[in-house]
């Protein structure tokens, strides 16, 4: 089943390599693109960009790929403020229109 999102775009950031991948039906689609390009799973974090919003309202740090107890992240939301800040910085760099 193909899912079309009209209000947001799914994305994944590699906080070590400083790159992001956007789009796909699932966060795992962008995750696979980065992993296939040499990223390590421990550095990949999922997020959502909300269309029509700006600033902090435009980004959400939630994805099923963020669940990783071995890295002390037990839920879908990125719990580590340092990791969240790195993801935010990358999204701001690559999508400056968001005004992050």
Label each residue range with its predicted role.
Residues 25-56:
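Amphipathic, interaction-prone secondary-structure segments
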Residues 8, 12-15, 61, 87, ...:
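Generic structural hydrophobic/aromatic packing signal, biased to beta-strands
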């Amino acid at each position: 089943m193909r899912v079309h999102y009209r209000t947001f775009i799914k994305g994944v950031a590699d906080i070590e390599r400083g790159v992001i991948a956007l789009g796909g039906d699932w966060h795992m689609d962008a995750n696979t693109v980065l992993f296939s390009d040499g990223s390590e799973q421990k550095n990949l974090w999922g997020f959502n960009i909300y269309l029509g919003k700006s600033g902090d309202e435009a980004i959400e740090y939630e994805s099923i790929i963020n669940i990783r107890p071995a890295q002390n992240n037990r839920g879908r939301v990125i719990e580590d403020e340092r990791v969240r800040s790195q993801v935010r910085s990358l999204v701001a760099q690559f999508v400056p229109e968001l005004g992050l």
